[in-house]
Design a protein with these regions (language model features):
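Hydrophobic beta-strand anchors of alpha/beta hydrolase catalytic cores
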Residues: 59-60, 91, 137
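Conserved redox-active cysteine motifs that mediate thiol-disulfide chemistry
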Residues: 54, 62-79
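Active-site acidic short loop of glycosyltransferases
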Residues: 54-56, 86, 114
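Structural microenvironment flanking redox-active thiols in thiol-disulfide oxidoreductases
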Residues: 71-110, 120-127, 163
Length: 172
């Protein structure tokens, strides 16, 4: 009896793990909400408008200088950008740093190939990431709709983000 129970538990776990890889990480098209049409300055004081990227897939990650997982996630987002930029993928890192730590943002972010935007007043983070989670990653589809959202970062999360991006690239 005990071996039957062990077998059933093992099969259940195996099925759960197998189906997890096939799950669609995207928000269903009919459930997607419009992304906030934000306007923020980059590190060089250039105004960046989300509306200027209409028709592209935009990955936005909210990060902070004090957030170790944020800094672990960024290299993976840079790799995605490098791999898919020719297919209309754009990546932005939006700093959620408070005025006390904003001076540290350029020192860290200038090493990255993806643009860092400054949300100095917290307007964008309060609307797109109201819980203030860091990192918090959103993928906006070509129609300007939020298609994927992810809280935090752990090793392996980059696979989920890439899966979502690939599925969006396949959408017509």
């Amino acid at each position: 009896m005990r071996s039957l129970f062990t077998l059933l538990i093992s099969l259940t776990l195996l099925l759960a793990l197998q189906t997890q890889g096939f799950a669609n990480p995207l928000i269903a098209k009919d459930k997607r909400s419009s992304a906030l049409n934000f306007e923020l300055d980059d590190l060089d004081k250039n105004l960046i408008r989300l509306s200027d990227y209409a028709g592209k897939i935009v990955i936005v990650t909210f990060w902070a200088t004090w957030c170790a997982p944020c800094k672990q996630e960024i290299p993976h987002l840079e790799k995605l950008y490098e791999s898919y930029k020719d297919q209309g993928v754009v990546v932005f890192a939006i700093s959620t740093d408070s005025p006390q730590t904003q001076s540290q943002v350029p020192r860290i972010a200038r090493k990255w190939i993806i643009p860092t935007l400054l949300d100095t007043e917290g307007r964008v983070v309060s609307q797109m990431n109201p819980r203030g989670v860091a990192p918090y990653t959103v993928i906006i589809d070509r129609n300007g709709k939020n298609a994927f959202e992810h809280d935090g970062y752990s090793v392996g999360d980059e696979v989920k983000i890439k899966e979502a991006l690939v599925k969006l690239l396949e959408e017509k």
